[in-house]
Amino acid sequence: MNSPVFYDHFERHAHGAGLKGHSTHYCPGCGHGIVHRDLADAIGELGLQDRTVLISPVGCAVFAHYYFDVGNSQAAHGRAPAVALGHKLANPDAIVISYQGDGDLASIGLAETISTAQLGLPITVIFINNAIYGMTGGQCAPTSLIGQKTTTSPAGRDRAMGSPLRVAELIAQLDGPIYVERVALFDPKQRVKARRAIQKALRLQAEGRGYAFIEVLAECPTHLKLTPELAEAWVRDQMVPVFPLGVKKDLTVEPWFHCGPPSYDVEKFLALVGAEPLEPDTEPPVPATSAIGDLSLKFAGAGGDGAQTAALLLTRAAIDAGFDATHIPSYGPESRGGTSYADVHIAAGEVLNPAAPEPDILVAFNAPSLAKFAPMVAPEGTILYDGGVITQLPALPAGCRVIAVPFTEIARGLGRPVAKNMVAIGALQGATGLLPPDRFTITLRHLLKDKPSLLPLNEAAFEAGRRAVCPPSVPT
Amino acid sequence: MSHFTTARPRPFLDPAYCKACLRCVEACAKHCITPGSTLNTITGVAPVELHLEHCTGCALCVQACPEPFGLRLDEGMSHLEGEFRLEDPTKLFGKKRVDVVDAPIEPDEQIPLPGCAPLVLKGAYASAIGAVLAGCRHVFGYPITPSTEGAELMAKLMPELGGTFVQAVSEVAAVNMMYGAGGAGVPAMTFTSSPGFSLMLEGISYMIGAEVPGVFVNFMRGGPGLGNIAPEQSDIKLACRGLGHGNTHALVLAPSTPQEMLDLTLAAFALSFRYRNPVIMLGDGFLGQMTGVVRLPPTLSRPGRPAWAVWGDRSHRHNLISSIHLAETDLEAHNEHLNRKYAAIAKRETRAELFRCDDAEVLVVACNTPARMAKGAVEVARARGLAAGLFRPITLWPFPIDALLPLLPRTRQIIVVEASPGQLEDELRLALSHADRVPPPITHVRRGGGVLPQQTEILAQIAATQEAFA
């Protein structure tokens, strides 16, 4: 009886017509067939048929799904380990096998091979090394031997074409894998070892212990242009000296891999994204005024001035008050030092254009920012700047309202120069009446609900900024 | 058979399945197997011949045979030798236990969410939260500006929600992890930006070919090459016309607000599973960074398990995820199936926003962030008495031509506004051409390199057009 892990009829092989319904597509004497049988037997003997997902590569084994009666996925060239990882993470109970040849695993997919091995999640990689490209017709493989003639090394592989890659050794020296062995098929003794290695690799996965890698030195009689018997001898005499057989790594590891199950818990989700359920009959906030058609602001300073935080606070406060509002930062390398600026829009209806190329209000924290953006301020706009930092005024557009407030000095007076952005927000509120002052404090308290110790300073800075443009004697 | 020394099963061979590789010949220590001398009339090769007088039942020949139906151990079937019929394997082997039951489709479940205060979120975060709401618990990615915020938030959220975030070795690996997870039937996604999206195209072609769902959020940046990290819209061509090799298409969604980043990401997963096809979210660099008001939907999804998934259990065991169809007619039929799917998407899933289009003579066509500048320009133009409107395609592929055609009789001028050298305009012109419509004159406002079209220049173009009419 053939293994029950093979289909009774190879329906996917040319629709199972004629001989193809029970014959593989492999050439006579090919090592793939033997490894297929070993793998099928191992899956069957370990009782894993209903859990197995086999990833077939690009290469001669591309049609492994013709034969194996398990879940099958066929991957792009070299990407089988990444596909295998996707399957394992989707269903950690699945037994996932990445079955690959030397071109797939050791050439085009080397990055996926190494990174997946180093990750060490419990999957099984079966690597068929026959020192040649089979499917494309006998080209040089990363594992072809020095001197080996192939269609792309017609004079024999030489040093300039690189030396054969010893993959099992490469994988074994990584931290991720727990079991790495190189086996062969050239005589009955080797075939017994190969069967055992494949079975052990699968068992380690089934037990959740870790990543195992089995390199199989296999025969490609067709492209070696040898009879199967001579191909076996070639593997034994030519390949084995370059690719020594044996266990390269075998660690005893306790089962460690866990992931999931996925959670769809509503309360957990809301807490994670910071969403706060409303009382059932809560009416959405309504903008206090519709006078704000679409107001645009630009906050500009050096990195560390807090322009972004100030802009975000304003955005949030406006949204909390029922307005539509947007914030766009300058970003990228610029946001990691150098200038930093932010565009804010506030509208009673919908913010149409979120950019502020001609801001109604400019808040500038330093001289370069003021010089850069002041000329763009809309006619009859407002320019608010740190009067303590900026002492030399550039030419400012006529018709603008210009207000200097020493943000930094005031903040320093409160003991924390970094609070200058809150001083600026206070000054902005005081100078423009943009949103009632308590909207800012409500939002501020909300934002700092997990860091209440920071609240007094920020509130004080906000108030100090307001007072600097709006003395207490003048009603707000 | 009384001369057999043990009761162990002996090898058995159906000659039609012997390829005469002779590996069994040298495997047998007792020289029981010899190269054949008679050609098999079906296969044209001479199968090996078994002489089992000295056979010990060691099975080493069986282990040497590369063919599943080649040498096997005879467990009571030797009487069938010579009588085997290719046409009827069940007669030979008996009817195999049928493990494959009709795969149950576990349906998606919608779990109600309470009404919540609006969130204030960056576009990239809004998209990530949209994915979480869609039930996505598998995120694969590679850091690239300006998309990293999405991945960073997912790296935080996924472990808390029993999900997985993997920072892959490359975008190439990331898309293939999506192929694996998507092939297992779970919602998977990535955040990327233009150069990373280029690297993912191979995998996207495989996903489309193998009908694997998955959502790609691409915050387009300046190109070609390394370009820069400022916003552009120059992957429109790639997403609409160039999703890897072969006959590929995917729904391309173009949000223009943080709210739409959430809403369309949420919709993208449903569409991706409905059609078993990837869905591409094209944002621009601005949109990922833009903070705005975002309201949560009324439900959170718990995804089910599709019948076609390669899950790794009995009921899904017969499934296959593959894009290979070796026979020419098979591949042709597969592509015809894909074409019918593309046609169904084009018929059912196009979306557009029409802003003040009803009596518009000048139609501005724009998407993503430039559409917001265009909206501002239209609003100002209207205030000045100019009959302008904005046609904003939300699906770029398929282009929402059916929503546009009724506007054309009144339209005297189309102005395409985009942060690319004409890629949106090409989509528009192609859609008009397929609809056999001669459009009104088309002009454009195009910026690039990270410079977005500004409201003032759009407005100036509208005004100039209107002057020309007068």
Describe the role of every protein-language-model region:
Chain B
Residues 276-354:
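Conformationally flexible catalytic loops at phosphate/diphosphate-handling active centers
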Residues 230-284, 454:
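Conserved thiamine diphosphate
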Residues 107, 122-127, 339-362, 375, ...:
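Glycine-/acidic-rich phosphate or pyrophosphate-binding loops and their flanking alpha/beta elements
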